[in-house]
Structure formats: structure tokens, C-alpha cells
Amino acid sequence: VTASIAQNQNKDTSNSAPDAAIEVKNLSKIYQGQHGQPEKLALNDVSLSIPHGSFFALLGPNGAGKSTFINILAGLVIKSSGDAKIWGYDIEDQMRAARRSIGIVPQELNLDPFFTPRELMEVQAGLYGIAKNQRRTDEILDAVGLADKANSYARTLSGGMRRRLLVAKAMVHSPRILVLDEPTAGVDIELRIQLWDYVRELNRQGTTVLLTTHYLEEAEELCDKVAIINHGRVVACDETKTLLSKMDAKELNVTVAQTLNNVPDLLRGHGYNVNLIGENRLSFQYSPSKVEIGNILDLVSQAGLTVADLTTKESDLEDLFLHLTREDNAKIA
């Protein structure tokens, strides 16, 4: 079902896809202050190019400007300056074509409680001018796991079901780009997996996906490219693997057979940090470009310790996110 939806969605665009599904240049947004409050610079000269067919994550702390960025694409907020294009269409000069090219799943669970999912889907399709014989309401509801709730009132749906219904509504007009703003907030693990299976299949069939999430492990697993935004500015943008490789930080945990009261002196002063955890676990934080793991293990042996177990931990997207945002905050301060 998902494959047929995605194929229908992209069948007329494969020969005319632009290099960038979303492209913004020098985009800024200033909210005017009210009641004597100072103005707020929500986006500060943001430039981003999101390749068509990519699975792209836009990450940032609360108040970083992510929602403002998405709301500008959706036409809910007017930009102060800069340019933005969706599928090659300018969001102001070619507004209708731009809107037809994008489906947005909002963060807020805003649904009419007195309509059923089927009715909400039909209304949404009507707003986009989709002929009744071209609508795929039941297909999409089945794909997001709501076929058995199609005729239930929206007010009776759980939070996770409402979230999936928002995804379904965003897909009624077969958009080339799907924007997901915190889509798995309040969704249990099983339904989260089902939702991501659906979105992954859409992406495999050519749909460009833009994701914002606070579940950084999701972004790391799903997305091939990541942009991190802080205080309205892009502080990093690259392929996920490339960004992680720049962290140059690993952790080695060595459990030894002996009981320790402190870190042996022989293990100190070699260009890494080492801490004793409990009575027999040594935790080493080191830079792979400067220190080799074999050298650490040699020193452990020279200290007369017997290795009972060891584990390593690579830097993940959460480490990168915290590192870059803290570094940026320090520059601003």
C-alpha cells in the first residue's frame, strides 16, 4: 500500500525534480516586540539546501527557530528577508505551486473532534481540489494503521493515533516533500516503529522528508543529512556520518578483575581522561586521532590489572548536538 502511494505521488515528477527540494538563502525573520518588549530575531540569515529524495533532520533546542522555519515554508509566517523555494517554486511568487509540493505534519494535535478520520481526509482532499475518483483516503489510512478507526470520531482517538492522522492528512495531495515536526511525541514505541516504516518507504520511493525531533537517536538512525540550528543560525550542516566523524571522541570502559580504590598513577597523564566507576571499572575518554586504544590497554596491563571485560562507545548525535550548541552559546555569551 505504501509503495503504491509513493509511486503515485512521484510518478509525474521523476524527470523534472530540482536538485534541491527545499532551498533557502539568507532567510531571516524578526518578530516585532509587543507591549514594550524588544523585537525577537527568530531566524538569522539562514541558508540551507535540502536535496530532493533526502531524509533530512533539522535539529535545535527549544526556541532555536525550527518552528519558525517550518511555518514560513507552510505560509503561516511571513519572512522578513531572504528567499525560499519549495521544489523550485518561490514561496511568495509561486505560492500555490509551492504549497502543492509540500505536506506538513504540525507539532500541535489540532483536529476537529466531531469529524471521523475518513471525513477529515475527505475535507482535506477537497481543499486541495482532488477529484473524488482520485482520492486515496482508505489507502492512506491503512498505511498509517488507522483503517479500523476510519469511522470513529477524532475525539476518541489516542494521542498516537491523532499524530498518525495528521501524517495521513499531510499526504492527501501526494506532496513531493513531507515535513514532520516532532511527529513521534506521545507515540508509543510500537506505533512509532510503524510510523517510521511508513515514512521510510515513502522516502525510498522518492519523497523528500524533513524531520524535526527531540529524539536524537531517531534522527541519527533515519536521516542521511543533518542541520543544527541555534539562536536562529545554522551552526552545522552536513551528512550525518561526516558530522559525527568530526567529533573525534570515544569512550573506553574497562572492567578489571581486581578491586580498586582509585585510578593507578601509571594510567594518568597520557592525553586522555580516566575515572574509576565503582570498584573495578575504568572509564577512558580519549581522542582517536591522538590516542590509540591499544596503547590504553597496554598501560592497563603494565599497571598489573587483568581485563575482565571492555566496551567502547562512539560519539553519537546527542554528543554532537550538545557540543555544537554549547560552543555556540559560549561564543554568543
Residue ranges and their predicted role:
Residues 153-157:
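Conserved ABC ATPase signature
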Residues 178-181:
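Catalytic Walker B motif of ABC-type/P-loop ATPase nucleotide-binding domains
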Residues 74:
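Helix-to-loop junction immediately C-terminal to a conserved catalytic motif
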Residues 122, 126-149:
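Conserved ABC ATPase "signature" region
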Residues 196-287:
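ABC transporter nucleotide-binding domain
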Residues 174:
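Conserved catalytic motifs of ABC-family nucleotide-binding domains
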